[in-house]
Regions:
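Conserved ABC ATPase "signature" region
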Residues: 132-151
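Conserved ABC transporter NBD signature motif
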Residues: 69-80
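Helical segment within the ABC ATPase nucleotide-binding domain
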Residues: 196-210
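Catalytic Walker B motif of ABC-type/P-loop ATPase nucleotide-binding domains
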Residues: 181-184
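The feature captures the beta-strand-to-loop junction immediately N-terminal to the Walker
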Residues: 45-46
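A short, proline-enriched helix->beta-strand linker immediately N-terminal to the Walker B motif
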Residues: 175-179
Length: 225
């Protein structure tokens, strides 16, 4: 008996992105097409300035509509992301598609504790009580192998090392078990040993949740791993 082909989590067809320079629209990403199935990993590889991160931001609908223009189609589980109202897109971000950025200090709010920021994901998207959200957040910190998670819940981003901050970002991104994880150079700022640990962690959590991973990097060594 033939095994049915899984439906793609993400389908990108002829995606192009242009930015405005004065009165001129300059195309920086041209006609990208690919599909990504559950549990699969796809790497977008290129040098700095090649449009890798712009592609990811376009998929997430995070580019300013005033100064950028996105053409083509992006479908998540059969829904056209480019056609959705912004309110619906906000619900999808985090719940169905999440992103890990290169430098977690630019994504984590320095004024709030690590635990608070992870708990807010559960409160905002799932309506959990503060007590239950805290319990879930601590469990996630343990899952991403942060030692003494209950104590570190109340620490601020500057009290975490670079590798630990990236683990916290992974916990936040995977909190709601999204169908798609976009990892934008998640190990570039880390030393080789920590880099390997973070890659192993992403692969382990991907296997547990059958998550599709879009991995953005300039490093062929990372792709090989």
């Amino acid at each position: 008996m033939n095994t049915p082909t899984p439906s793609p989590v993400l389908s990108v067809d002829n995606l192009s992105v242009s930015f405005r320079r004065g009165d001129i629209w300059q195309k920086v990403v041209r006609n990208i097409s690919f599909t990504l199935n559950p549990g699969e990993t796809l790497a977008i590889v290129g040098e700095s300035g090649s449009g890798k991160s712009v592609t990811a931001m376009a998929i997430m609908r995070l580019l300013s509509s005033r100064n950028s223009r996105t053409e083509g189609s992006v479908s998540l589980g059969g829904r056209s992301l480019l056609a959705l109202p912004e309110e619906e897109m906000r619900r999808i971000r985090g719940a169905e598609v999440a992103m890990i950025f290169q430098e977690p200090m630019t994504s984590l709010n320095p004024a709030f504790t690590i635990g608070h920021q992870i708990a807010e994901v559960f409160i905002h998207h799932q309506g959990l009580s503060k007590r239950e959200a805290k319990r879930q957040a601590i469990a996630l910190l343990e899952k991403v192998r942060i030692p003494h998670a209950a104590q570190r819940y109340d620490e601020y981003p500057h009290q975490f090392s670079g590798g630990m901050r990236q683990r916290a970002m992974i916990a936040m991104a995977l909190a709601l078990r999204p169908k798609l994880l976009i990892a934008d150079e998640p190990t570039t700022a880390l030393d080789v040993t920590i880099q390997g640990q973070i890659l192993d962690l992403i692969k382990t959590l991907q296997a547990e949740n059958n998550t599709a991973v879009l991995f953005i990097t300039h490093d062929m060594g990372v792709v090989a791993e």
